[in-house]
Amino acid sequence: MRHNSLSTLLTTGLAAATLMASGQVLAYGAGDFFTRVGVAKVEPKSDNGSLAGGAFTVDVQDKTDFAFTLGYRFHDKMGIELLAALPFEHDIALNGDNLASTKHLPPTLTLQYYPLGGTDARVQPYVGAGINYTFFSDEELAIGELELDDSWGAAAQVGIDLLIDENWALNAAAWYIDIDTDATINGAAAGTVEIDPLVVMAGLSYRF
C-alpha cells in the first residue's frame, strides 16, 4: 500500500509537469517564505505490534484530513519546513475489532535540499530529513482506559513542486515518520504501539 501511494504521487507529478506550458518561471530561492496546503493521508504500517503480553494485536487505521506546512529557504538549494495539521483521529483495531481510537498532532520539522533550487526549472524536486514530535489525546477504549505517551522520532521526506507562476505551484510530498508510543491500559503498562506512518499530501504551494 505504501509503495503504491508513493508511486502514484511521483507518477502524477511527472505527468502534470509534461502538460504544463513551456517557458521560464522564477523558481523559489534564498530568502523566500512559503506555505503548502492540501489533503494528507496518514497510512500507518501494517503491523503495529501487540499489547498486554500479546493478548491483543494492534492495527491502527488510515486517516485522511487537511494539512499544511510553513517553510523558509535560507539558501537557493536549502530550506526548512514544518508540517502541521488538524488533529488526525485514528480507529484502532484490537484482534480485528475496532475497540479503540486516538487523536494525534504530528508536527514534523525537516531540513530540505532542492537540487534545482535557484534555477528557472518548472519541476523542482526536493528531499528532506528531520525530527517529529507526536502529541496524543482523546484516547478511547471500549474495554477500559487507554493512555498513549507522546513520541519523538526521525522523519524523512520527498516532494516535488510544479511551478505555475512566481508565487503558485502544484505540490505533492510524502513523509516517513517514526512514531512509537508506549501504551497504558487501566493504569498498567501494556506495551508499545509502532505506528510508523507514510504521510502522503497533495495540494498547492504559495511563495510570499
Language model region names:
Residues 2-11:
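Bacterial N-terminal signal peptides that target proteins for export
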Residues 47-54, 91-98, 137-146, 182-189:
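Outer-membrane beta-barrel translocator domains and adjoining extracellular loop/strand segments
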Residues 30-32, 39-41, 45, 69-141, ...:
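Gram-negative (and chloroplast) outer-membrane scaffold detector with strong preference
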Residues 36-66:
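N-terminal targeting signals for Sec/Tat export/insertion, comprising classic cleavable signal peptides
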